From Swiss-Prot:
Top-level taxonomy: Eukaryota, Metazoa, Chordata, Craniata, Vertebrata
Protein name: Glycerophosphocholine phosphodiesterase GPCPD1
EC number of this enzyme: 3.1.4.2
Residues bound to substrate: R70, H88, K89
Keyword Cytoplasm found: yes
GO cellular component: cytoplasm; cytosol
Organism: Mus musculus
Gene: Gpcpd1
Modified residues annotated as Phosphotyrosine in this record: Y611
Start and end residues of each GP-PDE domain: 321-621
Record-linked InterPro entries: Carb-bd-like_fold (IPR013784), CBM20 (IPR002044), CBM20_GPCPD1 (IPR034839), GDPD (IPR051578), GP_PDE_dom (IPR030395), Ig-like_fold (IPR013783), PLC-like_Pdiesterase_TIM-brl (IPR017946)
Amino acid sequence: MTPSQVTFEIRGTLLPGEVFAICGSCDALGNWNPQNAVALINENETGDSVLWKAVIALNRGVSVKYRYFRGCFLEPKTIGGPCQVIVHKWETHLQPRSITPLESEIIIDDGQFGIHNGVETLDSGWLTCQTEIRLRLHFSEKPPVSISKKKFKKSRFRVKLTLEGLEEDEDDDDDKVSPTVLHKMSNSLEISLISDNEFKCRHSQPECGYGLQPDRWTEYSIQTMEPDNLELIFDFFEEDLSEHVVQGDVLPGHVGTACLLSSTIAESGRSAGILTLPIMSRNSRKTIGKVRVDFIIIKPLPGYSCSMQSSFSKYWKPRIPLDVGHRGAGNSTTTAKLAKVQENTIASLRNAASHGAAFVEFDVHLSKDFVPVVYHDLTCCLTMKRKYEADPVELFEIPVKELTFDQLQLLKLSHVTALKTKDRKQSLYEEENFFSENQPFPSLKMVLESLPENVGFNIEIKWICQHRDGVWDGNLSTYFDMNVFLDIILKTVLENSGKRRIVFSSFDADICTMVRQKQNKYPILFLTQGKSDIYPELMDLRSRTTPIAMSFAQFENILGINAHTEDLLRNPSYVQEAKAKGLVIFCWGDDTNDPENRRKLKEFGVNGLIYDRIYDWMPEQPNIFQVEQLERLKQELPELKNCLCPTVSHFIPSSFCVEPDIHVDANGIDSVENA
């Protein structure tokens, strides 16, 4: 095939060590794999921007799609191997740039990085080969800093974190792999402050750091290629620098220092935990107190290369509020009016889908042998047989994580509510149903393969939560390693999702953070109960109120929040507040089962409503995605124009309008399948 020499040009400014690169749909552009992308070369400065170019041979007459990103190219791990690529920012327009070269030589001036067809759409990258360390200081359980000296008893403290790499002897290497390839990645540090009112992200700190406040979450994010080779130094200062200041000190108000070697975290073998570090005085180097440092380690998803072909992490197409089937056809165990189909089974999910549910919501966690299973509770009841008893049936509560997938399929298991049932034997017989789609504990892979792709999945990732009183969900104070747990679930979804619409959600803020950092395709919503009279308050400060949940979602750059209906009915302004911040908002809770409440919530402007027994309110019908697909076909095929099937107008009221604050790509939305 005749080649065409295409010169791609883009303008933009970079940080030291960064380059622009191009990635696209053909071999020459890496087949959407950023590791095989082509780096652009700096040509000359033009005003406030710099011109970057790359000359690439493409097949003449063949259409090619592509995107630009900025990041770092690092030396290969092995001789002759591919470069390690770190993506900092990339273009995520729903429709990528495209070209069909028809001449032997052509120059493509793509203007400013991130702007395509007049619309700027950029998103942050994900972890490709680097590790992210998060260190947090907060008052969720107790004040993070405790100093024993009397003169500091009433002091408030400021903290500054300094990041240093441990010294290593390095050979001088004057032979560069290329002008765009770095020998090593520079460690990065970002400081974040999250509260009800706002969030702040900074790459620099005041000389005396930031103040610790009871209502504020302070977080330090470090990206590094050497997670076990860092020295992290916390310096503590008095909040009120007008008192206890020793004249002539280099750092007025300096109280003491705590040091953490990242190897301590690495050697613990844990993805999350709490470390207590001694605080040493500024002069005598005696221990004067301690600091509690909450940490998580986020590792890249192993054995899976994320594609740049498309991303929905921050994309939401404006529609009327979507109906989402709670646990499929509804709660069948603990609510006032139980669903007629057992919850979280394929039959239940299929029932909701057949009644027009746009999405079905269900819960996923792992069996003992690391198989992702669909089940709501962290524990279940195992049937025990007693000897020499008139009633041989006894129920024993056991964590789901203690049973293998085969055991979950073969053993006679009951929901924990069976413990409260007077006739336990009868409750067991009622649950017995050998039709496979009615069986509890289907695997996530089985569910992905069984339901039609036009049904969206809202996958809630289960994790243990601690209540403010110290009690843990399911009385489980320990659980799986968070990285291993998520890697298995995410790979199962990414490898089996096809073209299905998927939205993740979780009550655990760290799960939301990790899902965002480990993959670039699917969005996640932060589940929050806010202020509730129904449920006990959670320990995590980020879960306490709906406003701080919004601030967290903004800080993590996730799609939005899934708020408790009880809190939204009490504070309707939260809905528009979330939208003004560019967030999508779903709602959940028993109050959503009331049709009058659903009417109010739709008027408020929520994007999705999760509720039980959709079959009670909607007849068997196609969902909105199927109707939209039919509308597209009608436009493309004239013979379908007179079809009497439901149309989009059946779902869209006259008052419907586009929400300008939600990330929406206006270019060719309807031509992208399953957007």
